[in-house]
């Protein structure tokens, strides 16, 4: 019996070693592939462009090469750089998630550097977000500067049970505030927190600031992204240029407390033994194989299942629900042949490219009858493109108004999806409004006409058309200007139709532009006509001030344009909001009245915001008395003199105000 035992031992050792070697190799390859960067979101500020042979382009190439070089600070996860002199100076940085390895950080930054030239071609300002890193560059100074606008809210669209909702309401904000306390005491400005969700499941939270922020600015930024994050989802995140917050019920980051897996056992040469002399030795081989093979199969099935569930959980952020109920045949009369569009645009030649939107590129074209058109070619790589394409065709084909861009045709040809609009020669409002060299062309008379035209266009959508339509993405870049500077509302990809008696709708997919979203929509997915009113109010304040809400730099303690305007109004100084380019030649009574209307539109309570019919009346009749505006929405101010996340007590007092839909404890600065 002893001899048989000695002979089984090397066999067991060999098969066990083979098993662990195979498993280790598989896991290693799995981990490497999991480190590929996962794209999340990007923004391109298309108010300033550069040309291929310009000094700015050369400076940008030098900057990106520096950030992605082998000598970059991947081990710390953060690096910034500045290249050139004004006006061609370019400033940039990368910030990797605090838990990723040096190699993962390097790969993500290198990937982002190549990706930005595709996603934001010829744009002087861009921000690209990935799960593993963020890359930013700008022609303005972005270093050590707190920016709390220009981001996005993403929610996990998986279903939430009532029991889970109760647990989430108790866990989300405390967990994120605990993570914030860790981040504020970390050199990387990075913190995580893990709490129990159920007996068998954990809850994970993560927050992070760019390390170049001061502790106070990081605290302020985290306060905003924690208070604004939806608490009624199975997972959610807010990302903006300066900080981020996220929670899930799965481990979406590497838990530093988990020790690394032990190295695989070394494979030693088994001792030479005599060949087996009995059938029992053969049976032992069969027994070993019978044990080892099922274990390998079980492990592989477990890993495959884990990959599937993890990817499905991640994908739920970005996969929209099916677009049911649309009838694209109602627009059949507008369908164009793809070859006709190719001919009109010279086969989409680069010299005809006039813009780039969220779902594709825009080209100028000329039809065979001489009609100039704008051709919107949806990107094949856009996961949302087909939904927005169908939505835009069905909606815009039924709309006819002088302040709405007119759809002339569309094309569905294989993977090609193309929209053909009337050509508007003066591009978009933001092209003039936010450019120091061009904003002078928008005197007060033109700005006032634009405000009125946009109001009439939205009124048509809400009340006067055959359909009640909520635009959901009103902003300066979606207001086109014709040859006479008349405004035309564009981009209906996010729009939704309401029923006859419907006043609001809920959605689990928050879309639009952060900074223009109303509080109830950004935090709870509730949108209505009053959501568009809020966006219109932000737009009015932008038109008056010439300042962009999505990249507003801190002034007198204000973190965004709305709070800045509210502060001036509260102190009796509304004229200080006016763009210096027009302040000497404006009708002051009209300006003050428009500031008043803008602040009425951005009030926190949707019920107190005026309807579009009332707004148009306010703009056209000076005899209408305007009510006193109340506090705007999305305002966060610490009621305690010190940093709001310094202590557990302060954190808890901060959390209570965000649980209610009304956000009653939020105050203007």
UniProtKB/Swiss-Prot annotation:
Localization per record: Membrane
Residue numbers of Phosphothreonine PTMs: 513
Gnk2-homologous domain: residues covered: 38-142, 148-252
Annotated binding of ATP, by residue: 354-362, 376
Active-site residues, Swiss-Prot/TrEMBL: 473
Induction / repression: By salicylic acid (SA) or by a bacterial pathogen infection. May be regulated by WRKY DNA-binding proteins at the transcriptional level.
PANTHER family xref list: CYSTEINE-RICH RECEPTOR-LIKE PROTEIN KINASE 10-RELATED (PTHR27002:SF1001), RECEPTOR-LIKE SERINE/THREONINE-PROTEIN KINASE SD1-8 (PTHR27002)
Family to which this protein belongs: Belongs to the protein kinase superfamily. Ser/Thr protein kinase family. CRK subfamily.
Protein name as annotated: Cysteine-rich receptor-like protein kinase 10
Species the sequence originates in: Arabidopsis thaliana
